[in-house]
């Protein structure tokens, strides 16, 4: 049942008994043009009890067009009901009634009343006034498709040939005396419904004619989004963005995200009027910057790190924490690890982390906290500490390659802001551009442009995760409840984002800088001894950083790092020491070395002409990964070293060979069954073994001191007849591939 409202007949009687309206020139008698009304005589009145981000966005758009704005209710208690869920809003009329007493006799004054939290102004006062004068009204209300709050009143509305039929009270514009005559009739409770009040006045035919009340049926001035999302598109000019109503071919001046369309308004507000333009880029990005002053200590930060699932390259992640370009004595570290598998990694890094940051706290898997409970605990640590000025949440699958990330986000001066991160070469990111009706992922029209950084700026989005910064004051004043992440059965990050959105706090995302990337974790198999080795497909950039020699690119670029110790035998850096060690350890962990016999059941024919003590990559499940390494790194180097040859980098024989004095110390002269052969030393001569090396008999050229991680690349069959020289002490390991057999 709607809140009690005034009866139309009673209102009409009251209005007829009032003194006559001050003379107002009929709109039909006024000149029709942009200069029909002086913009200086326009006043925008709005209502806001708190300076929310929605309110600041409204003011920002008003200031862009030089509107004069008067705000009612700032700092006062809202008693107008929960208008987001039910009827209410009468308090707005009471405030407006009092304010309009100032303008009751100003017949040339035009007032536009709009909401503020969910409104954006899209064009100038001049255009607004021109359209108002052309309407021929004394008071023009916005229109929508829904007869709210009483559907039973729908049949009393005049028929409309084209356009929206029903009144919406979120925006109206009119001559000050007319508005005063309307709102002075309000004598109801603050939580009675304002829209019902205006509706009942409008529905009286005599009153409608007497006061020249009308609706903006075709959204020439007011665009209410509820029920009209399919009608609205963005219209891009070089330095301006408008919304266009394609149903009526109009360019509205006021955009109102009424009802459940707040997120769609946030999307439009990223562009309108100049949030982002094709020529100017981000129009508002630098207006709120808070540059951290030099010579003064920066804000105190709680860095909350979460290891919630087995995560590749975790030791590298922990080391990157030490590289943040922010004074470590201003950072306290909270680390939650739910994975027993990662306890050794954290134990190795913990002494450094303890020495680096001002305070540290570790919560391990023995606490049996859920991901939501751990996040609530960390966030509350900042909330309860008045000295905690910023809360920086960081998941272990977020790779921050930009050490200035924390500083950049703080200087953006937003309540909540995340750095844009995505998986390498993928569209998977740490934000959603839109939500589906059930509040799960939906792709916004600009999602790809944002992920690929074709549009750069600071964006208002409905969902962020994995890395974000929140003001400590925001936690203490606007998000005081402890259970933010564990308050529902949904994913903790979804629960957090919903809690923030419901408070009217914007979730900002910055893609102004390259901040880093996300790791893929779903196929991370910890059954391997060194599971990171298998990440060449899922996380190729991180895999390369960990396993490909730091000088490989320089060698490929022709910087003089490739050597030729024998004719057509090339020597170049390929693998890191870590990869060499982990390959050897994987082989020894597997342990099923061949016996170096001619009979070999692993081969199609069951016979090996030149046997070695070895383990094939297929045996340890690493064949596909090694072939990807050949395609990505060995193939380009081969074509660089042998101009005119194009390799398919196909190899069916990929294996690690072990040489020992008491097992198989050497290998007799032979040709390889390949177009070219790759031979990588996996350990150090003089440290791990003595002797060894390779001799090319045709040239009587030997390589007696192989370098760990460096690859020999040489032709196989026909020309490069060679032998493995005896290993005299220790154990020598090499990785061999017969390529393009």
Swiss-Prot record:
Residues 650-741 form the Fe2OG dioxygenase domain. N-glycosylated. It is found in: Rough endoplasmic reticulum; Endoplasmic reticulum lumen; Endoplasmic reticulum membrane; Secreted. It catalyses: L-lysyl-[collagen] + 2-oxoglutarate + O2 = (5R)-5-hydroxy-L-lysyl-[collagen] + succinate + CO2; (5R)-5-hydroxy-L-lysyl-[collagen] + UDP-alpha-D-galactose = (5R)-5-O-(beta-D-galactosyl)-5-hydroxy-L-lysyl-[collagen] + UDP + H(+); (5R)-5-O-(beta-D-galactosyl)-5-hydroxy-L-lysyl-[collagen] + UDP-alpha-D-glucose = (5R)-5-O-[alpha-D-glucosyl-(1->2)-beta-D-galactosyl]-5-hydroxy-L-lysyl-[collagen] + UDP + H(+). Glycans are attached at residues 66, 286, 551. Keywords: Dioxygenase, Disulfide bond, Endoplasmic reticulum, Glycoprotein, Glycosyltransferase, Iron, Manganese, Membrane, Metal-binding, Multifunctional enzyme, Oxidoreductase, Secreted, Signal, Transferase, Vitamin C. Residues 1-27 form the signal peptide. 2-oxoglutarate binds at residues 602, 659, 679, 732. One of its GO terms (molecular function) is L-ascorbic acid binding. Residues 28-293 are annotated as: Required for glycosyltransferase activity. Disulfide bonds join 282-285, 382-388, 566-701. Its EC number is 1.14.11.4, 2.4.1.50, 2.4.1.66. It is a peripheral membrane protein. Fe cation binds at residues 670, 672, 722. InterPro entries: Collagen_mod_GT25, IPNS-like_FE2OG_OXY, Nucleotide-diphossugar_trans, Oxoglu/Fe-dep_dioxygenase_dom, Pro_4_hyd_alph, Procol_lys_dOase. Residues 298-523 are annotated as: Accessory region. Detected in blood serum, heart, brain, liver, kidney, lung, spleen, muscle and testis (at protein level). Highly expressed in the heart, lung, liver and testis. Detected in the walls of blood vessels in placenta and embryos. Detected in chondrocytes in embryos at 14.5 dpc and in adults, in adult kidney mesangium and vascular poles of kidney glomeruli. Detected around nerves and in the adrenal gland. Its cofactor is Fe(2+); L-ascorbate; Mn(2+). GO terms for cellular component: collagen-containing extracellular matrix; endoplasmic reticulum; endoplasmic reticulum lumen; endoplasmic reticulum membrane; extracellular space; Golgi apparatus; rough endoplasmic reticulum; trans-Golgi network. Residues 675-718 are annotated as: Important for dimerization. Mn(2+) binds at residues 115, 118, 256. The N-terminal domain mediates glycosyltransferase activity. Homodimer. Multifunctional enzyme that catalyzes a series of post-translational modifications on Lys residues in procollagen. Plays a redundant role in catalyzing the formation of hydroxylysine residues in -Xaa-Lys-Gly- sequences in collagens. Plays a redundant role in catalyzing the transfer of galactose onto hydroxylysine groups, giving rise to galactosyl 5-hydroxylysine. Has an essential role by catalyzing the subsequent transfer of glucose moieties, giving rise to 1,2-glucosylgalactosyl-5-hydroxylysine residues. This is Multifunctional procollagen lysine hydroxylase and glycosyltransferase LH3. It comes from Mus musculus.
């Amino acid at each position: 049942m709607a809140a009690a409202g005034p009866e139309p007949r009673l209102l009409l009687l009251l209005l007829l008994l009032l003194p006559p309206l001050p003379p107002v020139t009929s709109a039909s008698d006024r000149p029709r043009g942009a200069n029909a009304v002086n913009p200086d005589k326009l006043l925008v009145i709005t209502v806001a009890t708190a300076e929310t981000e929605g309110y600041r966005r409204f003011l920002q758009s008003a200031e862009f067009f030089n509107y004069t704005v008067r705000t009612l209710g700032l700092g006062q208690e809202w008693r107008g009901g929960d208008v987001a869920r039910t009827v209410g809003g009468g308090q707005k009329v009471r405030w407006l009634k009092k304010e309009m007493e100032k303008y009751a006799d100003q017949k040339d004054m035009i007032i536009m009343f709009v909401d503020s939290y969910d409104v954006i102004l899209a064009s100038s006062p001049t255009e607004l006034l021109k359209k108002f004068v052309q309407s021929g009204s004394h008071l023009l209300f916005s229109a929508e498709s829904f007869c709210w709050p009483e559907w039973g009143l729908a049949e009393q509305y005049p028929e409309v040939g084209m356009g929206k039929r029903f009144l919406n009270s979120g925006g109206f514009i009119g001559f000050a005396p007319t508005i005063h005559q309307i709102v002075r009739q309000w004598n109801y409770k603050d939580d009675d419904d304002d829209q019902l009040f205006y509706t009942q006045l409008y529905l009286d035919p005599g009153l409608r004619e007497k006061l020249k009340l009308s609706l903006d049926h075709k959204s020439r001035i007011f665009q209410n989004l509820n029920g009209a999302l399919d009608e609205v598109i963005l219209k891009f000019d070089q330095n301006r963005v408008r919304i266009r109503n394609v149903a009526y071919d109009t360019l509205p001046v006021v955009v109102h995200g009424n009802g459940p369309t707040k997120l769609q308004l946030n999307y439009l507000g990223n562009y309108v009027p100049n949030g982002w333009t094709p020529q100017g880029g981000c129009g508002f990005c630098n207006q709120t910057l808070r540059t951290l002053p030099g010579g003064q200590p920066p804000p105190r930060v709680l860095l909350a790190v979460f290891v919630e699932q087995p995560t590749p390259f975790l030791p590298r992640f922990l080391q990157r924490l030490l590289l943040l370009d922010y004074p470590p004595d201003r950072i306290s570290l909270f680390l939650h690890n739910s994975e027993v598998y990662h306890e050794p990694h954290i134990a190795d890094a913990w002494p450094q982390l303890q020495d680096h940051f001002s305070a540290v706290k570790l919560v391990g898997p023995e606490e049996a906290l859920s991901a939501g409970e751990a996040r609530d605990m960390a966030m509350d640590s900042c909330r309860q500490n008045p000295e905690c000025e910023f809360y920086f949440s960081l998941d272990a699958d977020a790779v921050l390659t930009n050490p200035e990330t924390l500083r950049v986000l703080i200087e953006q001066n937003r309540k909540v802001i995340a750095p844009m991160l995505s998986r390498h070469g993928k569209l998977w990111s740490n934000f959603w551009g839109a939500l589906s009706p059930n509040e799960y992922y939906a792709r916004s029209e600009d999602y790809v442009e944002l992920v690929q950084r074709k549009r750069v700026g600071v964006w208002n989005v409905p969902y962020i995760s994995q890395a974000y910064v929140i003001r400590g004051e925001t936690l203490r004043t606007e998000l005081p409840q402890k259970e933010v992440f564990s308050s529902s059965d949904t994913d903790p990050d979804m629960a957090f984002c919903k809690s923030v959105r419901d408070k009217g706090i914007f979730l900002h995302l910055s893609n102004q800088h390259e901040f880093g990337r996300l790791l893929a974790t779903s196929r991370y198999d910890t059954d391997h001894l060194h599971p990171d080795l298998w990440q060449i497909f899922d996380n190729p950039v991180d895999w390369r950083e960990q396993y490909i020699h730091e000088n490989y690119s320089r060698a490929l670029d022709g910087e003089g790092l490739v050597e030729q110790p024998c004719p057509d035998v090339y020597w170049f850096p390929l693998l890191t020491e870590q990869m060499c060690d982990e390959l050897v350890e994987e082989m020894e962990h597997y342990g099923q070395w061949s016996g170096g016999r001619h009979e070999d059941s692993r081969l199609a024919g069951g016979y090996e002409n030149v046997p070695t003590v070895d383990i094939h990559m297929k045996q340890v499940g690493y064949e596909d990964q090694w072939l990807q390494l050949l395609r990505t790194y060995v193939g380009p180097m081969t074509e660089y070293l042998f101009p005119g040859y194009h390799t398919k980098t196909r190899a069916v024989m990929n294996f690690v060979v072990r040489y020992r004095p008491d097992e198989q110390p050497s290998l007799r002269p032979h040709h390889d069954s390949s177009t070219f052969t790759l031979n990588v030393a996996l350990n150090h001569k003089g440290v791990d073994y003595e002797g060894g090396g390779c001799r090319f008999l045709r040239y009587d050229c030997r390589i007696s001191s192989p370098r760990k991680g460096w690859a020999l690349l040489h032709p196989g069959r026909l020309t490069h007849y060679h032998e493995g020289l005896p290993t005299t002490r220790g154990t020598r390991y090499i990785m061999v591939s017969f390529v393009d057999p």
